[in-house]
Amino acid sequence: MEGKIISVNGPVVDIYFPNDVPHIYEALEVENPIKNEKLVLETRILFGENKVRAIALGSTEGISRGLTVKRTFHPISVPVSEEILGRVVNVFGEPIDGGEKIRGEVTPIIKNAAEFRRVQPSYSILETGIKAIDLLTPFPQGGKIGLFGGAGVGKTVLIMELIHNVAVAHGGISVFAGIGERSREGNELWLEMKESGVLSKAALVFGQMNEPPGVRMRVPLTALTIAEYFRDYLGKDVLLLMDNIFRYVQAGMEVSSMLGRIPSAVGYQPTLITELGEVEERILSTDTGSITAVQAVYVPADDLTDPAPATIFSHLDSTLVLSRSIAEMGIYPAVDPLASSSQILEPKFVGYEHAEVARKVVEILQHYESLKDIISILGVEELSEEDRIIVNRARKIQMFLSQPLFVASAYTNIPGVYVPREKTIEGFKAIIEGEVDDLPEDAFYMVGTLEDVKKKAEEHGALMY
């Protein structure tokens, strides 16, 4: 079953098939005579008499009209087995780390989500060891979590910290999808995981910035297929990390434009909701295991109402918003406690004490936010005694939400800290109840637990009796 190329326009290739026409999403193969390698195409549109329009998942340099295209009769497929752990692969499951070819059951990357009757919602908490997350936006195991932020506010660093903390502390399987991000960052992550000894329990799938849009659009599906294998066949709880899901949307926008579809709001593809649903709805907890997905989401121009972040929001269980104004204060991770949220921050899931402490922390920060205009005009001295206490505690809460990260210790020279959830609750409870009103603000900056705060205050000789 062969066809002939009749047109090449960048990554878009039109092919004529005299007999049977390929199915939508079927993978096609053409031999590149200049590079002596196989180029994979994906069927996207059937048009005219026996013609198809396909998107190339590689460079079309050397591809010309008249070349023979072969059908494969299946979608893009990848080999899945335990051999993929510790390896770095591309969208086709081929090694790009210089290692041996991966053997395993060849599985199509385009498929339906798990059957409705197999879905089992999970409400257990995935402890991250990061105070701002564990207190205000607890992650549900088997849930979907989004890290929202503009350029340079720390999304990738936080993703790498989560890999370090969750993979090291919990020892589970991790699958990382590098979608349209910098190749340098992918290389750094690979070396970091090698050094920390977690690479043997992780699979990395890369389709970076220099790849064609067809590849960037399929990398999340390859990573999901690998994660589903560990969940469904080996009964594992899998941590799936995607950096950056916005680049998946961008790739879809490029493909949509090349296929001649009329764009919708702000130039996005008209199929934006459908395309995101195809990825997000496959991230599920089932009767055999779970997939917990942490997704970095780039926010264009720091605008959370942009159609891409706004559509992604609707799929998530926890949303972590990183703020540029907080990053400018030197507080890292730059989590915005008032914009972030979690569906499981309720007493029945996290316990009464945790929910109550989190509520009071947010209440104090909201009160402080409402006083900022008065402070900037009249100064703190003009506030009532009660308001001054609120401001004092709010500033300490802000400082205490900062934390030294393991993956950033090489740059900050401050060793990273893993803070258990109980210690996090204990520390913030002490602040809101006024137990540490006599300690200076500086003592709360870039420390782990309440003990570290007291130790830092003593070292600076600032403890007041």
From Swiss-Prot:
Amino acids binding ATP: G149, G150, A151, G152, V153, G154, K155, T156
Catalyzed reactions per annotation: ATP + H2O + 4 H(+)(in) = ADP + phosphate + 5 H(+)(out)
Top EC class of this enzyme: translocase
Chief localization: membrane
Cellular localisation: Cell inner membrane
Annotated Gene3D superfamilies: 2.40.10.170, Bovine Mitochondrial F1-atpase, Atp Synthase Beta Chain, Chain D, domain 3, P-loop containing nucleotide triphosphate hydrolases
Keyword line: ATP synthesis, ATP-binding, Cell inner membrane, Cell membrane, CF(1), Hydrogen ion transport, Ion transport, Membrane, Nucleotide-binding, Translocase, Transport
GO-annotated molecular function: ATP binding; ATP hydrolysis activity; proton-transporting ATP synthase activity, rotational mechanism
GO cellular component: plasma membrane; proton-transporting ATP synthase complex
The keyword Lipid metabolism appears for this protein: no
Pfam families named among the record's database cross-references: ATP-synt_ab, ATP-synt_ab_N, ATP-synt_VA_C
Record's signal peptide: none
EC nos: 7.1.2.2
Record membrane topology: Peripheral membrane protein
HAMAP family registered for this protein in UniProt: ATP_synth_beta_bact (MF_01347)
Similarity comment: Belongs to the ATPase alpha/beta chains family.
Biological role: Produces ATP from ADP in the presence of a proton gradient across the membrane. The catalytic sites are hosted primarily by the beta subunits.
Protein name, entry field: ATP synthase subunit beta
Annotated source species: Dictyoglomus thermophilum (strain ATCC 35947 / DSM 3960 / H-6-12)
Gene coding for it: atpD
